[in-house]
Amino acid sequence: MEQNQPTENLITKSRQRTLTQRVAHAFADDGPLAKILPSFEPRPGQRDMASAVADIFEGGGVLLAEAGTGTGKTLAYLVPAIMSGHRVLISTGTKNLQDQIYYKDLPALREALDVSFTATYMKGRANYLCLHRFSDVRDSNELRSPIERAYLEIVNQWAGQTDTGDRGEIEDLPDDVPIWNEISAISENCLGAECPSYDDCFVTRMRQRAIESDIIIVNHHLLCADAAVRQSAYGEVIPNCSYSIIDEAHQLEDVATQYFGIAVSNYRLDELARDTHRLLASNLSDDPLSIRELHRIVNETQNRARVFFGSLMQLSATGDRTRVTAVTLTPMNEAMCQLVTSLGAFERTLAQIENSSEDMQTLARRAAELQDQLKFLLRANDPDYVYFLELRGPGIFLRASPIDVSAIVRDVLLQRHDGSILTSATLTVDGSFDYIRGRLGVDQAFEIRLPSEFDFRQQAVLYLPRQMPEPRSERFASSVADELIHLLAVTKGRAFALFTSYANLRAVRDQLGTTLPYPLLVQGSAPRTTLLREFRTIPNAVLLATSSFWQGIDVAGATLSCVVIDKLPFSSPGDPITAARMEVIEARGGNPFDEYQVPLAILTLLQGLGRLIRHRQDRGVLALLDPRIRTKGYGRRFLASLPPAPITHNLSDVATFLATPHNQGSKNTPQILK
């Protein structure tokens, strides 16, 4: 493990005191945080969590910390991390939390603790400009559309000024502009130290800043992507750290499943062909025969890729994901074998070119990797993986995802560190960490569970309407729309309506039509950041959204006074990954619904409902329109997990609650019915 280089003055006073004692002093009523931070208020839960985190920094091990909203968990782990003197890796599930830590919390703590430390904010490689690839694209003679030329000029102007190469600095570059994929610093295109632009490489600079930093902030996508690349022995950017803190840890299983799998897509084949044509157009070789042969093979590979991915489309069932097996892939064998053969010829021809450049060697490596991955996918016989076809717009992906990532998370992410803290507002089910322990491979761990600091009996009411049909009913969407119309009349808009699927959202949107007297914002009509900005600024707005708005959203005050959830968020048993995980549980004699689907749905539901009460002054209505929470036996598990807000089945109680001044919120609402 790489040796840490802590800032020398991190611990200059009271060396005889333990870290736990110094952290306790920082959080004391008369401590430095209380004296310097205007919004600081002593919270018992925050102190307890900070002490538990400090114990990990002193003694090692793993800590599972569930800290309800309002606990102040971010400061509870940042203060011990800063004071520990170790290099600490902090990974978050959302960009919002990354931004909060780097731009708000760390500067405030630097002043409050009077401690000098350095921090680096790291993003995934795809966020950074590759100077070498950009130079090739800019100087090539490829035909470009006017809009592509305009975007390239925007990047060109910015590239001469930026110190970081982070595309987030370019306000005029849309998130989904295709040209960025050609010039970003993704690992499969990286030439490493052989790159002519290596000394000026933005990714190399970022990694050097991280090596020299005490606190390194990443997100789960970079954490897992980097660990997966590290296994293949090239391209990692995160330096070794003694300790890690994984916030929003409930998201880690899904992200790890994505990055520790294998995927081959029509995009990757198209990009390989495009990059090869561009390189050949530069006349970088004195071997014209091999160059002509390579042109032929590239064209052949493109044609065979079109045939192969076109044949895959025949397997696509209803929905975006379709499970495949060695049997269902059999009709594609010939097309896949021809594509594999072309990739093999591609690689061999590149290797035979005399005086080939580093760029050509990188292309050969990419072709070999695609060849190996296609062979693995074609066999589709590894019992540890689930194989499926995924369609995303024009993208066609053949994937193999690990069914169980617990050993991967344990061995590749957690055991690399002397100590790790996994924290979230939602880690326990039925009062136990057993579910998350099993999913993330956490065998031995310390545990701490801290309730929310908010007074839900005063700040919220839970509305469960009695007359809703079952979600499978043809009347469900129209009933949701009717219920929304009546509920939003009481709340005067100011609501998130969160749906478990786009199909449900679209059906309710169509039912609502123009009947709502409030501004209606719909996911998909504009970028996520635009919708959030409009919701915060347009009075009485209503937002209809799906999964991406269930987590990581913070709208304070009366702007958001109601969160409506249409259905209990069960993962679809038709989803290939869900189905495979349920089969594994069933094969060992377990109950996949009780052991997997219900716990996962409970954590997801709590995240969705958690959008409402974010601060002590927030008040509002939590509305769940799924009758199964009342009528099914498993509904009791959901009810027991919900915040302790009063429950009502009547809109008149909701109106009374909203009309009641703060601190009298539960006076005229029913007692809790749990």
Residue ranges and their predicted role:
Residues V88-N96, I421-T423, G493-T500, A623-L625:
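Conserved RecA-like ASCE P-loop NTPase motor core of nucleic-acid helicases/translocases
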Residues E2-I36, H86-D214, H221, T276-R292, ...:
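A substrate-engagement module of RecA-like helicase motors
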